[in-house]
Amino acid sequence: MKRRDFLLNTLPAAALLPEVINGYSVKAFDTNSPLVQALMRGTTLTDHVLVIVQLSGGNDGLNMVIPVADYSRYFNARSNVAIPEARVLPIAGVSGTGIHPSMTGLQSLFNEGKAKVIQAVGYPTPNFSHFRATDIWMSASNSTQEVYSGWAGRYLNYEYPNFPNGYPNTDMTDPLAIQIGSTTSLTTQGPSVNMGMSITNPTSFYNLVSGTTDPAPDTPAGKELKFIRQVNQQTQKYSTVIRAAANAVTQQATYPTNNSLADQLKIVARLVKGGLKTRVYMVSFGGFDTHSVQVNAADTTTGAHATLLQRVSDAIKAFQDDLKFLGVEERVIGMTYSEFGRRIKSNSSVGTDHGAAAPMFLFGSSVEAGMLGVNPTIPANASVNDNIPMQYDFRSIYSTILEKWFCLDKTIVESLFPPNINTQLQTLPLLKAGVCSGVTPPPPPDPADVIVTNYPNPFITSTTIKFKTEGGHTLIQIIDTLGRVLKVLVDRDYPTAGIYTVNFDAEGLAHGIYYARFQNGVTQQVRAMLKVR
């Protein structure tokens, strides 16, 4: 039996430590855990920490980040759930875009220069199943690929291929990644084994790691059992340092009550300040599958979704304030994500259905504050099939964090993503200059600078797309309203900057809206095109 199969078939994915902090069980992932390994290489260069906040269920990004500049189309598409324009909270330094009125905490972080929104994050040909879409986000695969390792886990496997032998050691005494809660994440799965294990009975866990079990037989299965016991012994050692770190912090800033996300983030702040060298923390918050009764009909600024967004906003604000109070905010950034967004058009049940691209938030004192991207394109008469077209591929968010926060060489970053992922990884302007090398990332394009156009528009069978490239690799994809990539018109390197044209032949395609997605370096734009009869 292979070690990987033995582990997967005999034990849950993560080992639950017999430690409880603030009422939450803490799961420590060892070095071979994907996300753990992605960050351990960074330990020789940086003491940076990443906090991943998973919003489970598929968050309605269009009601979270609201296109005020295109409010009439937004309202027409979802009048029964739309947020009144006068109630939308402005974002410091950003015009024409605001956030949900319940997110005053995040608005304060924008005002303090500690938050960034990235518009329309997704991937080509999205999947609308919760389980499959979550796997795609955690593994960084294509929608057509089955990848069984996590995006960060592959990096850690590259850094620490010999784990678990020799860990913990004098160079790294602490767990490399910690998930707060009771579930594990594919994000931390390595190519061969996920080093987190879940044991729900603390007594049996103690017996296993304290050596009170019978000797393992001299068989292949016995060797695997010895391996599991070795991991559990390491986990027990990690539980000691986690408890010591938690006990080292006796005072923290105030957190909101009745907020499970805030409870989790409070533990993270405590462990960071307490001295753990852990590089990645994972927390989760569910309830975002809002097919019905997303808002209160009498006041759309209230209701189920508003409550969720307020708790997320309040928790992140309290966490950031606590990091500042504890004197460690310069070491930590956070990232939110959900497995998909929602459709542009609301449904008759005062809710929204599974959709494609959606915004992400980054937060922390090292984040380049403001907004990356532009308001999503909303049709004048949106249908139930219309989705927000992708502007940024989520894998470019991951790769930028690995390169610019954990200071990994770009060529190594690229090697850690699955082959044929149908995207070119971009280095995006997410973080302030100097975090790793002092090299200032290229500024994002001025949204007013029109880079891609087409004529005629509307068109009957074909249209000519004109685009401006700065040289280098240039990509133009044709995407339908479901987010599927129908054609790739341009995928090549241009030796010099200039203006070029390419023909889009839509013969055989149904009439309706299509999007031309242009990507060149850090720049991308989406052009809506209408095919008529």
Residue ranges and their predicted role:
Residues 433-446:
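Low-complexity, Pro/Thr/Ser/Gly/Ala-rich linker/spacer regions in secreted
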Residues 338-369:
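Histidine-centered active-site microenvironments of extracellular/periplasmic hydrolases
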Residues 445-455, 459-533:
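C-terminal outer-membrane/trafficking sorting elements
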Residues 2-314, 318-326, 345, 365-436:
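Feature for exported/extracytoplasmic and membrane-associated proteins, marking the mature portion
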Residues 57, 292, 342, 460, ...:
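Short, glycine/acidic-enriched loop or turn micro-motifs at the edges of active sites
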Residues 282, 330-337:
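Beta-strand segments within the central parallel beta-sheet cores of soluble alpha/beta enzyme folds
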